[in-house]
């Protein structure tokens, strides 16, 4: 990540000299030396003069802020650049982006998101470059659409600077455009079998079911999944009377592989969300009680409280 002057192109190289963020931090000095009066004034000019009840402060990025705890710097400013004033609010809103980050849809996803959710402590706010936003959006929105989401209004790219100092990426080879790092597998089926990752998917989904699948069909560019048996773990928007005739759809999944569906003899953990009148599959795992990570997930699920973030993608 670097701080530079924005370039209009999306290829990855910002015009002018890219400064290493570490150097910028060293130049800024210790947390106690930040000019918070100037910082507050600048934030106000960027965010329509919103009044904050707390003055800006430099705080540690907590380990449980999973989106940004390993982003490459250790401290962030509150309020952040998305108008979140408390760490609890930051965690709540940022948690919904962790599953997308795990899809590796663009190499700049974490830098872009964390420049807003957990902005680095400098003497004035620095926003991500518009071209970085556009590059991440163009690579990640197709993945988001598998889950029934679109690029949210709060991250609309024309809000960010294109002719001013801004946060940029410095790729290993800046002559090449960033490429999505994901596989051709349907994104909801490309899941890591780790208890933490399954919990994250559970929290990002509206409902969860233990399911035996009767058949899988192609329909209007989607995969249509017809259950044989199902047991609700988390009903969310599903009404009990709808449960009997429930069918699921793997959005845009007609032609991408979902290896879990190659063998329907197993029970599955199915997670999803309702979009309009459809119930979309957002994650699928083989129901395997012999697997250590799956067993750990089942134990944690009983007492785990998920944050609420329904408003994030509006």
Swiss-Prot record:
Per UniProt, the keywords (alphabetical) are:
Developmental protein, Differentiation, Disulfide bond, Glycoprotein, Secreted, Signal, Wnt signaling pathway
Q: Which Pfam families match?
A: Fz, NTR
Q: Name the glycosylated positions.
A: 173
The FZ domain, residue ranges: 53-169
Would you name any one GO CC term? extracellular space
Q: Which SMART domains match?
A: C345C (SM00643), FRI (SM00063)
Disulfide topology: 58-121, 68-114, 105-140, 129-166, 133-157, 186-256, 189-258, 203-306
Signal peptide location in the record?
Answer: 1-31
> What one GO molecular function would you report for this record?
Wnt-protein binding
Is Glycoprotein found in the keyword set? yes
Q: Which CDD domains match?
A: CRD_SFRP1, NTR_Sfrp1_like
* Compartment(s) of residence: Secreted
Name the organs or tissues of expression: Highly expressed in kidney and embryonic heart. Also highly expressed in the eye, where it is principally localized to the ciliary body and the lens epithelium. Weaker expression in heart, lung and brain. In the brain, is expressed exclusively in the choroid plexus.
* Record-linked PROSITE patterns: FZ, NTR
State where it is primarily located: secreted
Q: Which GO terms describe its biological process?
A: actin cytoskeleton organization; anterior/posterior pattern specification; BMP signaling pathway; bone trabecula formation; canonical Wnt signaling pathway; cellular response to estradiol stimulus; cellular response to estrogen stimulus; cellular response to hypoxia
Q: Which residues form the NTR domain?
A: 186-306
Similarity field: Belongs to the secreted frizzled-related protein (sFRP) family.
Domain comment (free text): The FZ domain is involved in binding with Wnt ligands.
Q: What does this protein do?
A: Soluble frizzled-related proteins (sFRPS) function as modulators of Wnt signaling through direct interaction with Wnts. They have a role in regulating cell growth and differentiation in specific cell types. SFRP1 decreases intracellular beta-catenin levels. Has antiproliferative effects on vascular cells, in vitro and in vivo, and can induce, in vivo, an angiogenic response. In vascular cell cycle, delays the G1 phase and entry into the S phase. In kidney development, inhibits tubule formation and bud growth in metanephroi. Inhibits WNT1/WNT4-mediated TCF-dependent transcription.
What is known about its subunit structure? Interacts with WNT8, WNT1, WNT2, WNT4 and FRZD6. Interacts with MYOC.
What name goes with this protein? Answer: Secreted frizzled-related protein 1
Q: Which organism is it from?
A: Mus musculus (Mouse)
């Amino acid at each position: 990540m670097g701080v530079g002057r924005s370039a209009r192109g999306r290829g990855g190289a910002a015009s002018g000299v890219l400064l290493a963020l570490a150097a910028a931090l060293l130049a800024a000095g210790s947390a106690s030396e930040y000019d918070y009066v100037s910082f507050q004034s600048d934030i106000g000019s960027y965010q329509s003069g919103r009044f904050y009840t707390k003055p800006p402060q430099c705080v540690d990025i907590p380990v449980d802020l999973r989106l940004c705890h390993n982003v490459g710097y250790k401290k962030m400013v509150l309020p952040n650049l998305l108008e979140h004033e408390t760490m609890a609010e930051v965690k709540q809103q940022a948690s919904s982006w962790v599953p997308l980050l795990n899809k590796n849809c663009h190499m700049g996803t974490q830098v872009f998101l964390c420049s807003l959710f957990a902005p680095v402590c400098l003497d004035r706010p620095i926003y991500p470059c518009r071209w970085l936003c556009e590059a991440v959006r163009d690579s990640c929105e197709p993945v988001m659409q598998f889950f029934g989401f679109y690029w949210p209004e709060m991250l609309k790219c024309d809000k960010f600077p294109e002719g001013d100092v801004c946060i940029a990426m410095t790729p290993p080879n800046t002559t090449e455009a960033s490429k999505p790092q994901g596989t051709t597998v349907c994104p909801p089926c490309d899941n890591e079998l780790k208890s933490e990752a399954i919990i994250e998917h559970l929290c990002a989904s509206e409902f969860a079911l233990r399911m035996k699948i009767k058949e899988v069909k192609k329909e209007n560019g989607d995969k249509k999944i017809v259950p044989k048996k199902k047991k609700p773990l988390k009903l969310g928007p599903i009404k009990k009377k709808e449960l009997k005739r429930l069918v699921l759809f793997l959005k845009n999944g007609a032609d991408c592989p979902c290896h879990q569906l190659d063998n329907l003899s197993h029970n599955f953990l199915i997670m999803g969300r309702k979009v309009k009148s459809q119930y979309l599959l957002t994650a699928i795992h083989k129901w395997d009680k012999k697997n250590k990570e799956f067993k750990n997930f089942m134990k944690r699920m009983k007492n785990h409280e998920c944050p609420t973030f329904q408003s994030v993608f509006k």
